[in-house]
Amino acid sequence: MLKLYDCTSAPSPRRTRMFLAEKGLDYENIQVDLEKGEQLSEAYRKINPGCTVPTLITEDGQALTENAGISAYLEALHPEPALLGTTPMEKANIAAWNWRCEMGGLMSAAEALRNSSPRMKDRALPGPKNIPQIPELAERGLMKLGWFFKTMNRQLSYNEFIAGDSYSVADITGTILVDFARWVKVYPQEDQTALLAWHARMKERPSYKA
């Protein structure tokens, strides 16, 4: 059986949980307490030297530590329902929008949080090394996040889902982005009706509660 090293409160492993839920796959869930620093323990470093979550242990015992790799692996083994696209153009659009949601959205929210929260002092970046906060990066992250919500709203004004006509990994990443942005008090605006309607639809999917 698959094993997932997880932290329920963190956005990154939630992406994996939602992907697994959409695929209908069973797995063993092992919690890593980030508040207590368990990701930095010697025991966990042996599993994932990068000291991050998620880590997915495959059925043959190999460790996958990045959402991009995890989703590619699971899609290859379990192609239905397709979350990475089926045609060359679908695959391209989904990959592009997933990257935009990650880099333009999730990274902006993380930049804002990790460079401002007192609880993350000297933890401005995930991983084994302590990195000092840079307050200006928090300010920039908030601005980028607001801009990206406008981009999402524009895209969803013409498409049912982020990357087109079908639900995909881009919708998983986008859903978690909107939820994670609340941590830094950034929300979709009232006039971003397409984004708000899309997020309401996403909350109705069973995988939302994964």
Where are these regions (language model features)?
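GST-like fold's C-terminal all-alpha helical module
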Residues: 103-201
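An amphipathic, aromatic/His-enriched active-site/gating alpha helix that lines ligand/cofactor pockets
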Residues: 44, 202, 208
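GST-like domain detector, emphasizing the conserved glutathione-binding G-site
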Residues: 1-132
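Short beta-strand(s) of the beta-wing in winged-helix/HTH DNA-binding folds
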Residues: 54-57, 162, 209
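Conserved G/P- and acidic residue-centered "switch" motifs that form tight phosphate/ATP-binding loops
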Residues: 10, 171, 205
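Short polybasic/polar patches that bind polyanions
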Residues: 21, 182, 204
